[in-house]
Amino acid sequence: SNLYNSRYIPNIVLSDGPAGIRITKEYIQYELVGADATFDANQTYYTGKYSWSGMNYTEKAIANETEFKKLLTDGEKLYTTDNTKYYQYCTAMPIGTLLAQAWDPAVIEEVGRAVGTEMLEYGVTSWLAPGMNIHRNPLCGRNFEYYSEDPLISGEAAAAETKGVQTKADGTYSGIGVTLKHFAFNNQEQQRMGSNSVVSERAAREIYLKGFEIGVEEAQPDYIMSSYNMVNGYPTFENYGLL
């Protein structure tokens, strides 16, 4: 975040799905320590580093004045807190499969608009949903996230939910976006980071990619998330024919 700010790049605040946004129910507020602050032995100071994955933030307490001064001199951001717990809540929205069974894009769009309202409330700019892979195998561990085994239903449902999040009731851009995923052929969870989906061009175009095509052309999602698996021997995220 500090690097982005230094280059005047707006922060992207992510929230996972799939049934509405996913946020921490309780949190502690931290206050930024000024660059010219003096060390207070009765106060605990914190800094933090992201893990290699970028998903886990490790908090570190600064217990002595020497380290405190060094970190501030190095330009590190330090924080303090009184450890008061605050609480926040969001709505559990219907899962993708249930939304598709509504057979009503207008209803799905309103659900998306409700998700977008909560995103704006909590400062989320990118929703890591909706998932729209095809229901190929009933044993897929994330089928509940996805809409259907039918690419037309999947595409229209994704387009409707995308429009709901990304546009206001008056049709103007809301300033926040969705992430259609997982592009593409992510139809199993077991060994999904190393599996190889072997698929013909016809099956790819008519079944597995058609929903994404509809969602992109009808609703222009802000983001697309690639999948971990390979397709016909090549990783999806560096597959020239796919991208």
Regions found by a protein language model. Give the residues of each.
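Glycoside hydrolase catalytic-domain context in secreted enzymes
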Residues: 1-243
